[in-house]
Amino acid sequence: MPLSYQHFRKLLLLDEEAGPLEEELPRLADEGLNRRVADDLNLGNLNVSIPWTHKVGNFTGLYSSTVPCFNPKWQTPSFPDIHLQEDIVDRCKQFVGPLTVNENRRLKLIMPARFYPNVTKYLPLDKGIKPYYPEYVVNHYFQTRHYLHTLWEAGILYKRESTRSASFCGSPYSWEQDLQHGRLVFQTSKRHGDKSFCPQSPGILPRSSVGPCIQSQLRKSRLGPQPAQGQLAGRQQGGSGSIRARVHPSPWGTVGVEPSGSGPTHNCASSSSSCLHQSAVRKAAYSLISTSKGHSSSGHAVELHHFPPNSSRSQSQGPVLSCWWLQFRNSEPCSEYCLYHIVNLIEDWGPCTEHGEHRIRTPRTPARVTGGVFLVDKNPHNTTESRLVVDFSQFSRGNTRVSWPKFAVPNLQSLTNLLSSNLSWLSLDVSAAFYHLPLHPAAMPHLLVGSSGLSRYVARLSSNSRIINNQHRTMQNLHNSCSRNLYVSLMLLYKTYGRKLHLYSHPIILGFRKIPMGVGLSPFLLAQFTSAICSVVRRAFPHCLAFSYMDDVVLGAKSVQHLESLYAAVTNFLLSLGIHLNPHKTKRWGYSLNFMGYVIGSWGTLPQEHIVQKIKMCFRKLPVNRPIDWKVCQRIVGLLGFAAPFTQCGYPALMPLYACIQAKQAFTFSPTYKAFLSKQYLNLYPVARQRPGLCQVFADATPTGWGLAIGHQRMRGTFVSPLPIHTAELLAACFARSRSGAKLIGTDNSVVLSRKYTAFPWLLGCAANWILRGTSFVYVPSALNPADDPSRGRLGLYRPLLRLLYRPTTGRTSLYADSPSVPSHLPDRVHFASPLHVAWXPP
C-alpha cells in the first residue's frame, strides 16, 4: 500500500509525535528505507510507457516555440541622448576623492568596452530581420527598420558607409578620433546636410584620391540627364559574392562594379543608367573609378563617399533605375494594387540614404550581418512599446564560443545580511542601461545588424516571385513584388512613417557603438559598471546604503527625509556622469524593499507575492499519476527552486525532480509527493539575517559515534551501525541544534558548513534542512574542536572552549572590501539635520 501523506510527515519528523531524535534521525540515513519510500511514492520509476505530458499550466518544454504576439500598434521607445562622460573616473574623484583599485579597474573596463570573439560568422543580409511574424511580414519589417533607425539617430549604432568607414550621430569619444581604426574623418555642419562628403585631412580614407577629385567634378557638374539604357546593371559581374554586386545599389554609396578584365574606360559614365538627382555624382565617380582602377579585374565594388544632393529638387524628373522604390514611378501600373500608386502619392520621397554627423575609419567590415533582429513586447506589463531582440548567439555556440567572464551575484543569505535592516528604501530606474556603455570601434565588424531592403525581403518571403542574383531587373520582374497584401500594408504604414517608407525600403548595415543586449559580455560589463558607481556613492555617504544588481539600483537611509536628500544628491551625481534616470519609475518602498524578486524587510526576506501566486497556480494545474516531460519539469523546478529556501525541507525536497531531469526521463507525481510539496510551499518562512556572535556549541562525529560540547557540558553517543563520515557529522550537528537550541554551531566538516544537504540520503536531507534552518556554522579545526574527544568516547578530557567569533558574510559582492581611508579633496559637506551621528555600517 502506498505511503500516506500523514505517515510520510511523521517519517520526516515534521510532526511532534516522533520519538527521541537520537534514535529516529539515524534511521533516515538507511539506504533500504530510502529505497522503499521512493518506490512507495513512485519516485524511482523513471521508465514509463504512457505518453508524456508536454504542458502543465503555462509551463511548456524548455525548447518549445512560444510564439510571441505581434502588435501592429507598437510604439518605438525613444532613447534620450545617452552619452556617458568620458572623464567618468575624474568626475568620481571630484565627488569622493581618490578611487579604490577595484573601482578604478571596473570603470576602465567599460571606457571603452572591448569585444574579442574567436571566430565571427557572417550571414547574408536576408537574415538581418527574422521573419518571426509570418502574418505581419511587411509591418514587422518597417517597425524593426524604424527601431534600428531610432537607435542610429540616438548614437547607439554605427552605419556602415563603406568597407572601411562608418558614420554615426551624437558626441564622438576620443578613441573614435585618435586611433588608427577610429580616426574622425568627416564632420559636417548639418546632420543630413546636402554637401558632399569631403575628407578634411589627406590619406585618411582608403583610396583618398577619390574624394577631392569627385568634389571638383561635382562643382563643375556639366553632365546633363542621360537616356536610360540600363547597361550598368546588365554589366555587373557577379563573382564577388558581395551583396553590393547585386541588383539594387546600396545605401553606403557603392557606385557600381567594374566589369571583369576591362581596360581603362573613360566613357562608362555616359552610357550608365542614371537618375537626375544623382547623375553628376554617379557619373563623375564611375568614370573616375573606371580610370583609376581600370586594370583591376576583381569583381569587387569600389567605395565612394558622398552626401545625396539637396532633395528639394524633384526626383521625378529623370528615370530612376538605381532605386527600387522610385523605379515604380516610371513604370506602368500592373493592377489596382500596384506599388506605382503608392510611389506616386507624393513628389518628393526624400534621399535614398542618410548619413551621420560624424564619420570614422573602421576595420574591414563586410556587407553582411552577424546576428538577426526582431521585435517583442517591451515587458509583460507594457505591450504598447516594443523591444528589439538581437540574436548574437553565434558567439556562445560551438567550439569557437567565447567563454564569458563570470561575476559574483549575491546569494539569498548574503543579500539578506546586507539589506535586511530598518532602513527606508527607494529604487532608481536607469533608462536603457546597456546602451550607456560605449564599445570600441574595432568591435563593430563583429556586431552587425541590418536588412537587405524591402524588395529582397518581400521576394524572399513571397512564393510567387523570385529575385535571381545578378540578373538585370526588367519591368515585369519589378512588378513581381506587387500584391494586395503588400499594397494594403504599405498604405497603412504610409500614415505612420510618411516618406520614410522610401528610406526604410533601402538596404542598410549597422554595427553597435554601445554594448548590445544579445552578447554574454554585456551583463558582466553592466554589473561591473553599476557596482563601481554604487561603491563610490557608498563611500561618499557612509551613513547610507547603495546597492545594485545590473540596472537595478537601490538606496537606503535611516529616515524618509534623509532618504529624499540622499536621492537628490545621488541623482545629480549620476546625471553629471551622463547616466540617464527615469524619474517616473523611481519607486519608494518604505521599510520593505522589493528587489531581485524578493521582499526584504527588517524581519528577513520572502519571495514577492506574484511568485507565490505563480507557485499556487502551478500546484493547481499539476497532474497526478501522469508522466511529465523532463523539459517541463525543468520549468517547474526553476519556479519551485527560487522559493525553496523559504520552505521547511528546502532544496532536498526537490531532489527526485532533479534526478529525473538529469536522467532526461519523464517524472510522475504521486498524490503523496504532490501533497507533500504543495504543503511545503503553502507556508513560507522568512530567511532571517545572520547575527555576529560567539560560538558556544560544538559538534563532532566519527563513523561510529557523535560528541557535543555545549558550554561546559559534554555529551556523547554511538550509532547502531557505522555511517559515512559526512552523514555522521550532519547528524551530530542536528543533535547539537535540537539539544541546545543554539543558532551558532562549530563544526570541522566542510559539507555541513556549506549547508547544502542535497547529496545526503533523501529523507535525511529533508529532515536535516528543517532542523538546521536558520543555523549558522563556524569552522573549527579538528585539533581544537572541544567535541572531538567526546565523539571518540573520551568524556574525561576537557579541552578549553575556544573564543570563536562569527561574522556573517555579505558574499563576494566586493561591497565592503575595506577601502583605505581616503582624505577628501572636497570642503566639508554641510550636514543636514540627520538622525544619525554615527556612520552606519552594514548589519
Curated annotation (Swiss-Prot):
Residues 219-250 are annotated as: Disordered. The keyword Cytoplasm does not apply. The record marks Y63 as: Priming of reverse-transcription by covalently linking the first nucleotide of the (-)DNA. One of its GO terms (biological process) is DNA replication. InterPro entries: DNA/RNA_pol_sf (IPR043502), DNApol_viral_C (IPR001462), DNApol_viral_N (IPR000201), HBV_DPOL (IPR037531), Rev_trsase/Diguanyl_cyclase (IPR043128), RT_dom (IPR000477), Viral_Replic_Matur_Polypro (IPR051320). Its EC number is 2.7.7.7, 2.7.7.49, 3.1.26.4. Mg(2+) binds at D429, D551, D552. Residues 178-346 are annotated as: Spacer. Residues 357-600 form the Reverse transcriptase domain. Residues 223-235 have a biased composition (Low complexity). GO terms for molecular function: DNA binding; DNA-directed DNA polymerase activity; metal ion binding; RNA-directed DNA polymerase activity; RNA-DNA hybrid ribonuclease activity. It catalyses: DNA(n) + a 2'-deoxyribonucleoside 5'-triphosphate = DNA(n+1) + diphosphate; Endonucleolytic cleavage to 5'-phosphomonoester. Residues 347-690 are annotated as: Polymerase/reverse transcriptase domain (RT). Residues 1-177 are annotated as: Terminal protein domain (TP). It holds the Pfam family RVT_1. The keyword Nucleotidyltransferase applies. Hepadnaviral virions contain probably just one P protein molecule per particle. Terminal protein domain (TP) is hepadnavirus-specific. Spacer domain is highly variable and separates the TP and RT domains. Polymerase/reverse-transcriptase domain (RT) and ribonuclease H domain (RH) are similar to retrovirus reverse transcriptase/RNase H. Belongs to the hepadnaviridae P protein family. Multifunctional enzyme that converts the viral RNA genome into dsDNA in viral cytoplasmic capsids. This enzyme displays a DNA polymerase activity that can copy either DNA or RNA templates, and a ribonuclease H (RNase H) activity that cleaves the RNA strand of RNA-DNA heteroduplexes in a partially processive 3'- to 5'-endonucleasic mode. Neo-synthesized pregenomic RNA (pgRNA) are encapsidated together with the P protein, and reverse-transcribed inside the nucleocapsid. This is Protein P.
